């Protein structure tokens, strides 16, 4: 909202879920098992698919998308049982955020959905308010969720994306030389960071 409103000019790590309140169509990026491989996803998001996604779904909301990159596959952790097939999620108290795509996915899997802020996940797992959650592996490790979770299922069910966005009016107000320099710097940075992302 700050970037969109202009009080902040740009931001990094704006995941698709952040846009849902403005345009729910952006949730297409959160479709489970959308791509068959990381290479396939990078080709799509770095090509026409990603360009059209940005142009048709994000930029009309007042943003200029400078890049789209993945921030890791989502995996499921829980305290109840190993997750080996979809039916294993039945009845597990599964934490998700308010994103309608994720809620629909866990509802379809018969999980018992608990909407909870990520900041409350560790405590929720510790005290049994929730049994399970999903995140990228680095997020799970960084939040020490291994201390309060017994099982990890490497499901790769969602490849989470982030964008570097700038307020569209700010970008359009830049001299074309500065626009080109900014575009080039972001593209070069993405090439350098991409091997470290997943």
Name each model-derived stretch.
Residues 1-40, 48-198:
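N-terminal secretory/targeting leader peptides
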């Amino acid at each position: 909202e700050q970037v969109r409103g202009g009080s902040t000019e740009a931001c990094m790590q704006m995941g698709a879920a952040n846009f849902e309140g403005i345009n729910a169509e952006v949730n297409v990026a959160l479709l489970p098992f959308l791509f068959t491989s990381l290479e396939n996803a990078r080709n799509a998001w770095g090509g026409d698919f990603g360009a059209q996604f940005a142009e048709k779904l994000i930029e009309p909301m007042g943003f200029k998308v400078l890049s789209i990159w993945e921030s890791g596959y989502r995996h499921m952790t829980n305290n109840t049982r190993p997750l080996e097939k979809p039916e294993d999620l039945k009845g597990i108290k599964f934490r998700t955020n308010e994103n309608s795509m994720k809620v629909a996915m866990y509802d379809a899997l018969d999980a018992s959905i608990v909407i909870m802020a990520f900041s409350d996940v560790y405590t929720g797992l510790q005290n049994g308010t929730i049994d399970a959650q999903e995140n990228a592996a680095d997020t799970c490790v960084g939040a020490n969720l291994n201390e309060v979770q017994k099982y990890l299922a490497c499901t790769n069910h969602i490849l989470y994306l982030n964008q570097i966005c700038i307020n569209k009016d700010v970008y359009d107000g830049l001299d074309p030389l500065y626009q080109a320099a900014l575009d080039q710097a972001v593209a070069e940075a993405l090439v350098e960071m991409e091997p470290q992302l997943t």
